[in-house]
Amino acid sequence: MADKEATVYIVDVGRSMGECRNGRSVTDLEWAMQYVWDRITGTVATGRKTAMMGVIGLRTDETSNELEDDVHFSHIAVLSNLKQFLMPDIRKLEDELKPSKTDKGDAISAIILAIQMIITHCKKLKYRRKIVLVTNGQGRMSDEDLGEIVKKVKEDNIELVVMGIDFDDPEYGYKEEDKDPHKAENETLLRTLVEDCDGVYGTFEQAVAELDIPRVKSVRSVASFKGYLQLGNPEEYDSALRIPVERYYRTYPAKPPTASSFVLRSEPEAGQEEAESSEAAAATQKGSQSGDAGLTTVRTMRTYQVEDKSAPGGKIDIERDELAKGYEYGRTAVHISETDENITILDTFAGLELMGFIQTDQYQRYMHMSNTNIIIAQRANDKAALALSSFIHALFELECYAVARLVVKENKPPVIVLLAPSIEPEYECLLEVQLPFAEDVRTYRFPPLDKVITVSGKVVTQHRNLPSDDLLDVMGKYVNSMELVDADEDGDPVETFPIDDSYSPVLHRIDAAIRARAIHPDQPIPPPSERLTKFSHPREDLIEKSQKHLEKLIEIADVKKVPPKAKGRKRTRETEKPLSGLDVDALLHHEKRVKISPNNAIPEFKQTLAQAENIEAIKDATKQMMVIVEDQIKHSLGNANYDRVIEALGTMRDELVSYEEPASYNDFLGQLKDKLLQEKLGGDRQELWWLVRRNKLGLVTQRESDQSRVTDTEAKEVSLTKMKE
């Protein structure tokens, strides 16, 4: 369980915070709120009820706090007491944090008030307590009783953080020129207070610059297995090895937040209110707790139906309890009763049993099948730690890996895992990955890349499809020039692509977008951080460094640019010439097709359109396809020809849209529907029209083709018209 937290933010909203300084285009308050919103929304995103936050406004127009009778606490307002923040709290806070019309208000008194809030809320319970002061240091600050403040902060273990706008920070290397003497005194006062409290003092120059750095979520470790690492059967042999161990994730994919479905809540009618189920009530309550009273969660309802010709609609509803499980065997379902279902479950017992050992040079890395886990000795068990350490060192010295059978829980399927020793200063463990069974391995045979084997079995090493020695040499130089490892001042290799700086673009981009929309629902989402996109493209220095090798590679490999695929009207498009320059049609002596054969209708229809020189030829080919399609429908025994008809209609639709003749298809489809409606094509063909709708082969609309005169509404009306009333 995560630690309880209590954080109070003191935000300076004085009149001076509404000014723009030092060449910035935003006010001091807007600049400071970037940091405050980042911290608040980051806490809200966790959804933890134990993460409490409070907000105090400093130098406000009004006074609202429990010590407001004291003149020292005037112009200080408690905007939010310590509580779990939700979306409405963020929206409310955004409206209240605006520059005031006064510069009166004491930051030191605001710190005292924040201490009082934390003490009242946390009492003597275990909390991580924190006060964050955000100010530009322009107001009046009292230096009375600083010793008592420091004593109380240390006594209650409160972390004091002061973030100042344009504050001097020698450690970061920032110094404001022509600083106001009064502000310089306030900075010195706050720095002394923070240093005495062992807190954190910084300038917003550094804080805002570091906002682009994605924060990696700290995950509390939870054991996925607790049991024994054993060699041999300890129940039968006294010499069997048995070590208590625990298993934890070493790598596990971090997943971005998932979207949930919500609907606007509508007030139930009088008759429906009593019929509301407890599940719906719970969903409504959950929706209101989520922070928006206008939304409610969507309930999922699943029904099961079976065919019954005697029932209305041809189907009847059945309960889930009436269903039975079955396994597909060929095209038949084999039913296994619940009493016999135990035969499909393998009886296993939790444990990690060693099966054997393998030399490190004989193991192939592609055998990894899972995330990486670590195996450590049972916590607070010195005997187990000593035994496991001996086992790890033995594997390391013999350059071996161990192969083991792992069952995480009783009656869970067993997996085969590989155990590799990992020894670091003051830390030892076994790295564990899952290995495949025989059925998990995919073995494929591909032709070799360094030779060509002819039909007669002859091996050819010099071929136009094989790289030459010059090509291999140039490719090697090009690859080396793109190396991601640089050298430092001493010539030692330095990793250019450290894993600690390679953040997940999807995860952090979605998180940043959600937080931006939560704070500013009407403003556009800002672009992604450069830290997330810097690995989307090669580095400029590497591109420049490798350019000469790339040009040499293009020259030797004889790389040619493929001409782009022509776009536009198919019937006015020139025939694309192959790279060889040969006229394939002239070589094959293709004659222009006059009549389309029903046995090969689709290919011949495409070929006829490709050879068409005018619109009349396109319309003639369309008419021929109309006759063929209608004939297939008329002579279809049941739905035997329906698949062929649907394929033909889809081809006609796509081709005629490409040739900018959607009217021909729309006219044909209208005629086809009329004939189906009047049962002129072999009787009742309602199922065929349903297939036309399901495959989205309706009229071509203006949205799909500029040459069409059919609107979406008209197309929908034609598609949804019933075949029979």
Curated annotation (Swiss-Prot):
Disulfide bonds: none
Keyword Aminoacyl-tRNA synthetase included in the entry's annotation: no
Region feature (Disordered): 259-298, 704-725
Main localization of the protein described in the UniProt heading: nucleus
Domain of life the protein comes from: Eukaryota
Enzyme class: hydrolase
UniProt-annotated location(s): Nucleus; Chromosome, Telomere
GO biological process: DNA recombination; double-strand break repair via nonhomologous end joining; telomere maintenance
Keyword tags: ATP-binding, Chromosome, DNA damage, DNA recombination, DNA repair, DNA-binding, Helicase, Hydrolase, Nucleotide-binding, Nucleus, Telomere
Reaction it catalyzes: ATP + H2O = ADP + phosphate + H(+)
GO molecular function: ATP binding; ATP hydrolysis activity; damaged DNA binding; double-stranded DNA binding; helicase activity; telomeric DNA binding
Pfam family of the protein (one): Ku_N
SUPFAM superfamilies: C-terminal domain of Ku80, SPOC domain-like, vWA-like
EC number of the protein: 3.6.4.12
InterPro entries in alphabetical order: Ku70/Ku80_beta-barrel_dom (IPR006164), Ku80 (IPR024193), Ku_C_sf (IPR036494), Ku_N (IPR005161), Ku_PK_bind (IPR014893), SPOC-like_C_dom_sf (IPR016194), VWF_A (IPR002035), vWFA_dom_sf (IPR036465)
Sequence ranges of Polar residues compositional bias: 285-298
Record keyword DNA repair present: yes
GO CC field: chromosome, telomeric region; Ku70:Ku80 complex
Protein role: Single-stranded DNA-dependent ATP-dependent helicase. Involved in non-homologous end joining (NHEJ) DNA double strand break repair. DNA-binding is sequence-independent but has a high affinity to nicks in double-stranded DNA and to the ends of duplex DNA. Binds to naturally occurring chromosomal ends, and therefore provides chromosomal end protection. Required also for telomere recombination to repair telomeric ends in the absence of telomerase. ku70, of the ku70/ku80 heterodimer, binds to the stem loop of tlc1, the RNA component of telomerase. Involved in telomere maintenance.
Family named by the database record: Belongs to the ku80 family.
Quaternary structure and partners: Heterodimer of Ku70 and Ku80.
Protein's UniProt name: ATP-dependent DNA helicase II subunit 2
Source species: Aspergillus oryzae (strain ATCC 42149 / RIB 40) (Yellow koji mold)
Organism placement in taxonomy: Eukaryota, Fungi, Dikarya, Ascomycota, Pezizomycotina
Gene transcribed to yield this protein: ku80
